[in-house]
Amino acid sequence: FLWQAQFMGYFTWLPVYLVDVRNFTADGAVQINQIPVVVLLVFSLIGGMILKTGVGVVKLLTFALTLQALGWAMIPFAGDPIIGLTSLVVWGIAAGLTPTSLWALPSTLVGGHRAGTDAFAVVLTGRYLGILAGPLIAAGMFNWTGDWITVAYTFVAIAGATIIGTLYLGTRIRDLKSGN
């Protein structure tokens, strides 16, 4: 839920932010919005290759979520073109690695041979709730504060909560596997 909320928040927030705050044209904002999309597509595939090397799902997911928080945290400094472009690429990398990890998570939790459709129900339920919540959170924070940067900081906090949840999940998985 929290990851998808920030994902949808990003892709609904970014074009409006670019037009309202950075004075881009609507067409320019759409073109810039494609940078993280292209990076995301590439890193979704790379994420699968990384998982096949034996890197654990929780490790990759924690890394991806940390990158995502970093991408959000760079937004207030994105007036500098290098930082702005870097934030788009960093966020795109994270947004590609994260869903790859999430789709691999059910087989990690219940075992690959038992990860049927019901194992994905939780992932999909969280995803769809996040699709609904992300744009509402972004709009709500902007309406409350009148400041788009507050939206970025809100999603840094959401990313932090997601990282904490992922680390807790990793600890629980390790404990279950060791019999504790």
Specify the residue positions occupied by each region the protein language model found.
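Helix-to-loop junctions at the C-terminal end of transmembrane segments
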Residues: 43-56, 142-143
